[in-house]
UniProtKB/Swiss-Prot annotation:
Disulphide linkage map: C2-C16, C3-C12, C8-C15
One GO cellular component, as annotated: extracellular region
Major localisation: secreted
Places the protein is found: Secreted
Family listed: Belongs to the conotoxin M superfamily.
GO molecular function: toxin activity
Keywords per UniProt: Disulfide bond, Secreted, Toxin
Stated name of the protein: Conotoxin ar3e
Native source species: Conus araneosus (Cobweb cone)
Membrane-crossing residue ranges in chain numbering: none
Length: 16
């Protein structure tokens, strides 16, 4: 999902 691709361990609403 977008969080993994963006390298962010939080929810997509927070990171993306």
């Amino acid at each position: 999902d977008c969080c993994i691709i963006a390298g962010c361990p939080f929810g997509c609403t927070i990171c993306c």
